[in-house]
Amino acid sequence: MKLSAQRLFAIARKEAMQLRRDPRSLAMGFIVPAAMILFFGYVISFDVKDIKLGVLDQDLTPRSRELVEAFQGSGWFRVTERLTRDAEVAPLLDRARVRMVVTIPSGFQAELAAGRPAPVQALVDGADANTASIALNYANSIVLAYSARAALGMQDIRPPIVVQGRVWYNETLTSSNMIVPGLIAIVMMVIAAQLTALTIAREWERGTMEQLAATPVHSAEVVLGKLLPYLVIGLIDMLAVVLIGMFVFGVPLRGNPVLLFAMATLFLIGSLGLGIWISAAIKSQLLATQTAMQATFLPSNMLSGFMYDIGNMPILLQAISHAVPARYFINVTRGIFLKGVGIPVLWAQGLAMIAFATIGLTLAVRSFRKEIE
């Protein structure tokens, strides 16, 4: 049977009418994506600042107070507890009232004056390994800078070698600039697959699948017709989350927005096709949405490079990550948002998006044809 645009759009209109009468799908399509971006965008942060610091100054001299002020004025630490004895250290760390305790022993100023090393102890809460590692690095930087000034008699003398570091693409090292473009890919895939995971299962539960199967239409027309309204919703969602990223989180969009939305269209088609494939195989709306969530959220979150560097994963997981579509779209969103790159850099990701859209549609059409036959 030859494909007919008239029949395809008739099915699309019918699906759009059903969608308007389904508050759950409307909420999932128009409210959930923005809510997820806002929630995860604020909750997920790798910025470590204002670390709660306890100080046990047993020397109580001008030099020890200068070191404490160096911690306080760094912008990395906030002195929230001033201790008077060693017994107070453990309870503070146990109750997580501070992340680190710096102990300046008595004789600190005398040791510096004599030109001998003056030990300073830093006890850090290692329950959060990432924060602990960063806090120790911050503390080492502060103490090294103070030590250099102390060795020079507290004079501001320029060192002979100065590293002039410059960060490209994310100049302020703001974690939201990295997180939000990645979140866009995760949210788009999860929501798209969730929406279409309901569509065929809904036909089974309402008993209208037999009527649909008896209709003289090609299975590709049914799949494309059911997919089209959700593609429109997905592109509206994409526009919404991009605007939220730019104007709420301040993420710069340095690249071509047309290229971003072209790539997003391919990514959405593949995700929507994946949802229809799941929906055709599983005839329960509840089970279909649960399966779609497990098939999209976990791999996209864990194996796409969104949260964890793929290069640090075991070789097997690195190989598996090549089959995760979100991996490629995250490279697209970060590349266009932060780097402003185009097709000369993103052509491989573009091919991956085309392959994903083709595979998603093929799986959807074949699974639907198998079910109605």
Protein language model features and the residues they cover:
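Extracytoplasmic/periplasmic domains immediately adjacent to an N-terminal transmembrane anchor
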Residues: 1-177, 345
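Transmembrane helix boundary and interhelical loop/hinge segments in multi-pass membrane proteins
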Residues: 19, 96, 193-217, 227, ...
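Short coil/turn motifs that cap or connect alpha-helices
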Residues: 22, 218-219, 342
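Short hydrophobic alpha-helical segments within the ABC transporter permease transmembrane module
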Residues: 27, 31, 208-209, 222-232, ...
